């Protein structure tokens, strides 16, 4: 991705500023304890260990806009309904010349999403500067924090530094977390401070946290002063560095956590900060190489990069929560699929498949909830698939089963992986379809069929009969399951019942004669009406009722722009949701305006929010918004819809120079480049997710090319249809087809 113009944003009269050196680099600067409005600590995470850091590279225990601070470790729970266990937070003390500095005089904080690394630069008086570099390692549960002390002029004596690991769960006094017991000890042979712990929570957890440094240190083994300290003597032009390593392992991660900790100790001592960071960056290099976009809108690109970073840092070994902090890291199948779609369309399909694999693994529990008459997944799934939600009418949601099926099916559409379809996707899809058929489809005396009374979207209230959103999801589940069965060569009378149910549900979709509505008799506006186009592509773009419904919601979007009846704006994940729906129509102007509206609400570190408007702010680092945004921007550039691939379909006409590399359905990749308003490259090649590819029809707007620009090999495949050049593409092994 290209370098972007440096962008300065004045935040307040006290010279705070946010800088953008590239779409990956997010920097803010300030003085003292003066933070910019709506500052949220940036996130470093590897999907297990999740930590937000402040401007000194430490942590405060304060909750802002429902942001969660402290060291979190996904999967370690106090109870089924309770929070994740608290693993404390990091503090420090810096002193020299007889003064201890609680806060720096000046500070700069940078989150580099390219390398998943944080850099803080702090000035303490006029003589000392401290640079902090931090990674949460992508492959290991290791946190590495390097402090570099620089003397700006001769110091009056040594600098005393202490890294303190505060295990307290309270900001106003020392109090150990509930049901957690710690035993710190200094291991002189290993030169490490090892903290063994036992936690009695949802499971019984036993583990070890080890602190060590790459320089001689003094250890404080007391629980209230736990940490490592040392004195350093930097001179002008001769900085001194020390790296603190924090190693985590427990019985949920491995059967022998003590051995894993020893392996980690050997690794950090052999590699040091630079070696660990290089290994870490190689993993992130691979992730960033999967999809590439270069677009002329700097803010859209920055939000895109931030969205992918957010999705990758919250990709747990189980699946994708709305964030490891929000909602205690539980897994909503609805939000999980939003994350899935963002990862899938950005070509991170090996990571994306964790969602359908998680649902396959927890399928036995989902079936047990219906006495084996279909799969009913928990509303807020724990890591074992069991329910983590408190009682409420949200338990009457059922559309999340169609989200589960959608992710499972979409993974096959992208990869063309028959083994995956047979072993993972189809069993999940079939049981979700059985659930809808046997539990939720109501047959009426006149032969019609509707979905029973359920909670559709929470803002619409409970007990809505024949809801549009849920009905479209059921239709898509039925129809995609039947398609999967045909691909696998399976025959069963049950599949005929699925097809029949889908056909009958189509006939009873609620409408007012002009447009589809959320449920019969509904008088309020709701985003529910866009779902027949996205995320469930069950309706044709020629369906006038759906088109009018989507445009009506677009026109009235600020009347129902949040999941909850709060605020007066359009939340970013709704904006991206509508943009995805409108991308199916090639509506460039509206899609672009919605993407810009979503992107305008990201934070200083490109984080996406659940809500971020003038008077309401909720849940920063909200992965649902990140997933919706990434997928929506991908769809404006390359829209996949069953057997059709639309190239630059909703890309703004005013964009004259841009390029992208994105995955296509059928296990293919499109590498596209537009220069001076003309297509100069469109290479279709086989992707790497399976050994085969499926033929697809590619559509390219005619304003981007002429017949003379079409490649000789592609010319026989070309057909001109209604303002588009149409190419039917089927690739052999190793083949790349250049349409230009």
Region spans (language model):
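Short coil/turn segments at secondary-structure boundaries
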Residues: 276-289, 295, 299, 318-325, ...
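Acidic/polar, glycine-enriched structural segments that form the non-catalytic walls/loops
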Residues: 18-52, 58-330, 361-364, 731-740
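Positively charged n-region of N-terminal signal peptides that target proteins for export
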Residues: 1-4
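Active-site core of glycosidic bond-cleaving carbohydrate-active enzymes
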Residues: 329-365, 397-418, 423, 467-641
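Hydrophobic h-region of N-terminal signal peptides that target proteins for export
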Residues: 8-17
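The feature captures the catalytic groove of carbohydrate-active enzymes
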Residues: 250-252, 322-332, 373-423, 431-499, ...
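Non-catalytic C-terminal accessory modules of carbohydrate-active enzymes
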Residues: 22-148, 588-739
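Structured mid-domain segments that build the active-site/substrate or prosthetic-cofactor binding neighborhood
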Residues: 245, 410, 429, 434-439, ...
């Amino acid at each position: 991705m290209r370098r972007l113009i440096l962008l300065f944003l004045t935040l307040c009269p006290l010279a705070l500023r946010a800088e953008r050196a590239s779409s990956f680099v997010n920097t803010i600067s300030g003085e003292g304890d003066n933070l910019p409005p709506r500052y949220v600590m940036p996130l470093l995470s590897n999907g297990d260990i999740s930590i937000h850091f402040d401007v000194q590279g430490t942590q405060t225990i304060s909750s802002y806009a429902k942001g969660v601070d402290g060291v979190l470790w996904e999967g370690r729970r106090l109870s089924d309904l309770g929070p994740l266990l608290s693993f404390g937070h990091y503090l420090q003390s810096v002193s020299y010349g007889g003064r201890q500095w609680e806060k720096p005089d000046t500070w700069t904080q940078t989150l580099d999403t390219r390398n998943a690394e944080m850099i803080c630069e702090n000035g303490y008086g006029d003589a000392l500067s401290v640079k902090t570099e931090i990674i949460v390692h992508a492959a290991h549960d290791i946190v590495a924090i390097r402090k570099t002390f620089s003397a700006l002029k001769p110091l009056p004596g040594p600098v005393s530094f202490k890294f303190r690991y505060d295990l307290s769960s309270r900001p106003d006094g020392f109090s150990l977390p509930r049901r957690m017991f710690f035993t710190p000890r200094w291991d002189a042979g290993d030169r490490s401070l090892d903290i063994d712990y036992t936690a009695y929570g949802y499971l019984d957890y036993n583990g070890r946290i080890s602190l060590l440094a790459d320089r001689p240190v003094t250890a404080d083994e007391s629980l209230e002063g736990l940490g490592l300290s040392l004195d350093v003597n930097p001179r002008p032009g001769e900085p001194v560095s020390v790296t603190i390593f924090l190693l985590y392992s427990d019985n949920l991660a491995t059967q022998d956590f003590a051995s894993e900790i020893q392996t980690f100790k050997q690794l950090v001592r052999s590699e040091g900060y630079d070696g660990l960071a290089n290994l870490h960056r190689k993993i992130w290099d691979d992730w960033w190489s999967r999809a590439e976009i270069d677009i002329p809108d700097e803010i859209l690109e920055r939000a895109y990069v931030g969205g992918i970073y957010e999705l990758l840092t919250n990709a747990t070994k189980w699946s994708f929560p709305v964030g490891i902090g929000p909602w205690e890291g539980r897994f909503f199948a609805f939000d999980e699929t939003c994350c899935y779609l963002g990862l899938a369309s950005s070509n991170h399909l090996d990571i994306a498949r964790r969602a359908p694999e998680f649902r396959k693994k927890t399928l036995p529990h989902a079936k047990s909830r219906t006495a084996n008459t279909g799969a009913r997944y928990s509303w807020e799934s724990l890591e074992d698939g069991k329910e983590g939600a408190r009682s409420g009418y949200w338990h009457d949601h059922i559309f999340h089963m169609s989200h589960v099926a959608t992710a499972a099916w979409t993974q096959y559409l992208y990869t063309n992986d028959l083994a995956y379809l047979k072993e993972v996707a189809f069993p999940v899809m079939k049981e979700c379809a059985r659930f809808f058929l046997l539990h939720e489809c109501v047959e009426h005396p006149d032969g019609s069929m509707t979905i029973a009374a359920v909670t559709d979207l929470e803002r619409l209230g409970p007990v809505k009969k024949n809801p549009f959103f849920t009905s479209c999801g059921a239709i898509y589940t039925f129809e995609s399951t039947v398609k999967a069965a045909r691909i696998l060569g399976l025959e069963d009378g049950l599949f005929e019942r699925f097809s029949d149910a889908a056909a009958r549900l189509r006939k009873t979709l609620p409408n007012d004669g002009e447009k589809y509505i959320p449920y019969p008799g509904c008088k309020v506006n709701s985003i529910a009406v866009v779902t027949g186009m996205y995320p469930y592509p069950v309706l044709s773009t020629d369906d006038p009722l759906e088109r009018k419904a989507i445009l009506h919601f677009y026109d009235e979007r600020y009347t129902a722009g949040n999941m909850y009846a709060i605020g007066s704006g359009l939340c970013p994940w709704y904006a991206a949701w509508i943009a995805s729906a409108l991308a199916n129509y090639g509506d460039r102007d509206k899609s672009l305006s919605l993407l810009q509206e979503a992107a305008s609400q990201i934070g200083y570190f490109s984080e996406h929010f659940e809500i971020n408007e003038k008077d309401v702010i909720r849940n920063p680092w909200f992965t649902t918004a990140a997933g919706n945004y990434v997928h929506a921007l991908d769809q404006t550039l390359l829209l996949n819809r069953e057997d059709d691939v639309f190239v630059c379909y909703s890309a703004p006409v005013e964009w004259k120079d841009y390029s992208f590399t994105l995955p296509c359905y059928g296990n293919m990749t499109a590498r596209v480049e537009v220069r001076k308003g003309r297509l100069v490259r469109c290479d279709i090649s086989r992707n790497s997710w399976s050994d085969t590819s499926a033929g697809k029809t590619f559509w390219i707007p005619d304003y981007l090319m002429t017949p003379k620009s079409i490649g000789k090999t592609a010319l026989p495949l070309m057909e001109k249809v209604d303002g588009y050049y149409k190419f039917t593409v089927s690739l052999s092994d190793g083949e790349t087809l250049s349409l230009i």
